[in-house]
Amino acid sequence: MTPDDIPQSGLGTGPATSPVLAEARASGPRRGLALVVLVALGAMLLWLGLTLPEGGAVARLGLILGGAVALTGAEAMRRATRYALILTDRALLEVDADGQPGRVLATLDGIAAVERGTFAMKPSNGFLLRLEQPAGRVWAPGLWWRMGRRIGVGGVLSAPQTKAMAQIIEFRLAGGDPRD
């Protein structure tokens, strides 16, 4: 799939008439809360690591490293959740705020199944895709991850939007056309 096959802005059609079937964006309050929690955790761990009078050097170093990891994770989530996910009739992909295409998560032809049950190993407010072929590991905190044949979509995304997206993918896998 090339960028010419993907819609170039918001909802509508792109140069190759690839209509957007569904769109999922990070929910503002969930995104804000997740970032506040990660930054607060990172700051608290750093503060404890730097000011704790008792405890060994290893414990203090562990707290400092934990704080740095939490702050790095918060920044990674801030960057990742600027993107939205769109489902076209060909693929599930990222788009930035201007509608410019980013990474392709999976083509619809490469999806074997959708798992969205209560006990599915999926992100919060999301679903899990099983792919036909394994792909590289990628993690966009709060938005999606991919490991081998599995893609987890969700986190700070809006639950109704991800549910609709999962239902459309399931319908397409069953041979239906959601535009009918």
Q: Where are each of the predicted segments found?
A:
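A membrane-cytosol interface segment of integral membrane proteins
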Residues: 129-180
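Hydrophobic alpha-helical transmembrane segments
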Residues: 53-67
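Short aromatic-glycine-enriched beta-strand elements
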Residues: 124-128
